[in-house]
Amino acid sequence: MKGISVLGATGSIGTQTLDVLANHRDKFRLVAMSVGKNLTLAEEQIHQFKPPLVSVMTDEDRKTLASKVPEGTRVVCGEEGLIEVATAEKAEILVNAVIGSVGLAPTLAAIEAKKTIALANKETLVTAGHLVTEKAREHGVKLLPVDSEHSAIFQALQGERMDRLHRIIITASGGSFRDKSRDELNGVTVEDALKHPNWSMGAKITIDSATMMNKGLEVIEAHWLFNLPYEKIDVLLHKESIIHSMVEFVDRSVIAQLGTPDMRVPIQYALSYPDRLEFHEGQQLNLWEVGKLHFAPLDMERFRCMAFAYESGKQGGTMPTVLNAANEEAVELFLNNQLSFLGIEDVIEKALERHERIDSPSLADILHVDQETRAFVHSLIK
């Protein structure tokens, strides 16, 4: 039985991870988890799975939850708590499902503790891909993708030689506003943006899908996960989200991974790898019911965040850190009705333009640039 630690258990990926664990209690055991602000859900999860270790955000939350959990569950808090969860002794796999750059330090700690990393936190590789991949190689640690697109590529590459790969093709639904012109985007609301056509996701990633920044971050993540130059990473609009991604080889053969849009499938594959387990829930893919699959090229002028991501990734150094930090803050401002939807792009562009890149940043450099960028974004709103 594999011991599993989950960072971000009360979030969208976290709750779906616990669904997988509940469906395979003979294969997996939850040994540690961190939670966000939803302490009511956290309490339910703790009583259901009885993890020995739980981390919360603040000491006040720790005191609140500690009085409600069963005997045998220890509650810790803060960044130290996240790291304790990430490095829990009985965990074989860490599922990093927290949102944002807060997932970086726990991931590095888990790698040093030689845990297999199931990575749903894009920002870890976006902001510090060179540090994470280098440390993973140094400690012989596997980085297993949880994103459906990267999982699709990972599966398509099984048994293949990387020097025979021509390119990867990441598919994108286009998000909530895929059929709107840029003029129509001027007045869209938070409520409009949170209606994703295909996937069930958290608020931040749903907005990132609408701006296409989510796909931009996935491009940078793929660069690090598969050690590919950006010239070999393409993005294709595919509104049904049935083909999760494709790999083209030098002989022009293309292998695609298909399935109904259900995040629990790639989560389960990351946990069971290299094995496959039965998936008892969800819909079976019936292509005759789907009828048609649609594809369209990506318009970088229409989706400016994609252009920012490719450019930042190619420049490297601290540019992706700025991209990510500026985006996180801009999305939060939009969700709080302090910034327009198209204002998200403008803020990111200003942050990138002013930044003086550090070519080979240390962890301290990355954290400093991250905080400095966030402060700059807020200075634009005041």
UniProtKB/Swiss-Prot annotation:
Entry's Gene Ontology BP terms: isopentenyl diphosphate biosynthetic process, methylerythritol 4-phosphate pathway involved in terpenoid biosynthetic process
Binding site for NADPH: T10, G11, S12, I13, G36, K37, N38, N121, E123, G202
Descriptive protein name: 1-deoxy-D-xylulose 5-phosphate reductoisomerase
Family classification: Belongs to the DXR family.
Function field: Catalyzes the NADPH-dependent rearrangement and reduction of 1-deoxy-D-xylulose-5-phosphate (DXP) to 2-C-methyl-D-erythritol 4-phosphate (MEP).
Catalytic reaction(s) noted: 2-C-methyl-D-erythritol 4-phosphate + NADP(+) = 1-deoxy-D-xylulose 5-phosphate + NADPH + H(+)
EC number: 1.1.1.267
Binding-site residues for 1-deoxy-D-xylulose 5-phosphate, renumbered to this chain: K122, S148, E149, S173, H196, S209, N214, K215, E218
Top-rank taxon: Bacteria
UniProt binding sites for Mn(2+): D147, E149, E218
Organism listed in the record: Halalkalibacterium halodurans (strain ATCC BAA-125 / DSM 18197 / FERM 7344 / JCM 9153 / C-125)
Pathway: Isoprenoid biosynthesis; isopentenyl diphosphate biosynthesis via DXP pathway; isopentenyl diphosphate from 1-deoxy-D-xylulose 5-phosphate: step 1/6
Record flagged with keyword NADP: yes
Co-factor(s): Mg(2+); Mn(2+)
HAMAP family attached to this UniProt entry: DXP_reductoisom
Molecular function (Gene Ontology), one example: NADPH binding
SUPFAM superfamilies: 1-deoxy-D-xylulose-5-phosphate reductoisomerase, C-terminal domain (SSF69055), Glyceraldehyde-3-phosphate dehydrogenase-like, C-terminal domain (SSF55347), NAD(P)-binding Rossmann-fold domains (SSF51735)
Keywords in alphabetical order: Isoprene biosynthesis, Manganese, Metal-binding, NADP, Oxidoreductase
